[in-house]
Amino acid sequence: MTVLAPWALWEKTKDVMVLEQQYQSMCTWIAAIPENMKRHRHLCDPVVLQFAVAVRESNPWAVMTAYHKINGVHCSEDPRLIRDIPRSEWKYDGLVLCDWWGIYSTSELINAGMDLEMPGPTDWRCKILAWATRSRKVSIETIDSSVRRVLKLVNRVLAAQSEPVKDSDTEKNRALLRETTAVPVVLLKKNEANVLPLVKDSKTRYALIGDHWKNPAVAGDDSSEVTPYYVSTPYSAFVEAVGEDSFICAMGCYSHKFAPLLYSTITQPGSDAHGMLLEFFNKDPNGSSDAELLYTTTTEKTDLKFADSLPPDTVPEYTSSGSAPSRGSRWGCAGWIREAVEIARQVDIPVILTGLSADYEYEGIDRKSLGLPGRVDELIERVTEANPKTIIITEAGTATTMPWADKTPTVIHSWFGRQETGHGIVDILFGDVNPSGRLPLTFPRNLEVPPVYESDPKHIMTISVSLKNTGQCPGAEIVQVYVKDVSSSVQRPRKELKSFKKVHLAPGENMKIEVTS
């Protein structure tokens, strides 16, 4: 989370510097913190720049370190990330605090410049810090520097509390939010069917397909969850633009998280036959029932943290965060998809609005796949086949795969637009705002496309080749791997030997050889 200047006056720049994985990020009590291996150049060029802009231009009051390690050192105790880069290079004079329970030492933290342990009461200071001072691992001068920065933040907050609260829900701010929602929208695929911009007349008939028209994704969840003054839905904004008589609505299918759909992998009890066993009870009970209570709740939101493991013979049954602890399967979608297809044939231009939501994008979790939820991909393919002028709009804060992209003429990607989501999307559709945004991340064609060799802690890449002995005698061969840096800034050989492997093959033998570099 980076607060980009000049929009930040009092915000903390969170998670310095690199956090590419949220899975187990809160498990600070076990040795399961993810570790990122970053070369210094890779760290400084694409990663540090975004934080440098926020710190230099907006001068935030505090920055926060991430949980994990970079090249073997925890971010919260890395002097390069806390002292050398922000304070020496950027001249940052504010506070540095850790993410909740995100520290793992005492003297290393203080000496690196970590000022504040969160939350309180502290676990790694007090008596431990006193012993570190007595043993001369931490100097009094270093502690005094951190104390001054903490007091500086306290004085800043006290001064801000005395100022009157200003009403931010003004017409000027609404117009600004509307603009900042529409401008970053990305036109992923050109207007091949020449349907954009849409026209505001009574002759053109539209179909609004997808659950995001009336229930849009306005923001993520957890730490990014903020209650807005209002929410402009795309449906209401479309009504403002052309009226209710110019379009037909269709659900198509849900993209929000519910019980899983009934797929062919579900089998009947006690057999391998596909389907489910249903039991209907049409008789009213005569008296009180001794039926088992399946589910009860007293809160709307609960977090469960497990710091232990289950016995090997125990099958765990639980649900992910944000879901009610109930089990079952969901029927439907097939009829809604058929309805959407029929409606798409009847209108001039169908517009599908779907994507992810706060059900899938929130702090402390990774998505299990890059695909769109449920049967959304099927909905898009079938509607596009029924009407080639279909416009696809996806809402998401992260990348999604689009297996239907080659079959659709127009693809638009909208980010989470907060309270002006609806107006921002409709402004793009009718040409009031040009979709001039660009992707800050890669949208892979499928999950197999992104290279994963750089994710290996040792930066290992394996190359596979097939080798066959076509002769009549046993033989040996050395497989060699040469590389060439096509964009090196310094003079290097045209070919560099990086790895080799010697193999022995019998006559006619065909072998698959893996060479690791």
UniProtKB/Swiss-Prot annotation:
SUPFAM superfamilies: (Trans)glycosidases (SSF51445), Beta-D-glucan exohydrolase, C-terminal domain (SSF52279). Pathway: Glycan metabolism; cellulose degradation. It comes from the Eukaryota. The keyword Secreted applies. Keywords: Carbohydrate metabolism, Cellulose degradation, Glycoprotein, Glycosidase, Hydrolase, Polysaccharide degradation, Secreted. GO terms for molecular function: beta-glucosidase activity. It is found in: Secreted. GO terms for biological process: cellulose catabolic process; glucan catabolic process. GO terms for cellular component: extracellular region. It catalyses: Hydrolysis of terminal, non-reducing beta-D-glucosyl residues with release of beta-D-glucose. Its EC number is 3.2.1.21. It is an enzyme of class 3 (hydrolase). It holds the Pfam family Fn3-like. The active site is at D99. Beta-glucosidases are one of a number of cellulolytic enzymes involved in the degradation of cellulosic biomass. Catalyzes the last step releasing glucose from the inhibitory cellobiose. This is Probable beta-glucosidase O. It comes from Emericella nidulans (strain FGSC A4 / ATCC 38163 / CBS 112.46 / NRRL 194 / M139).
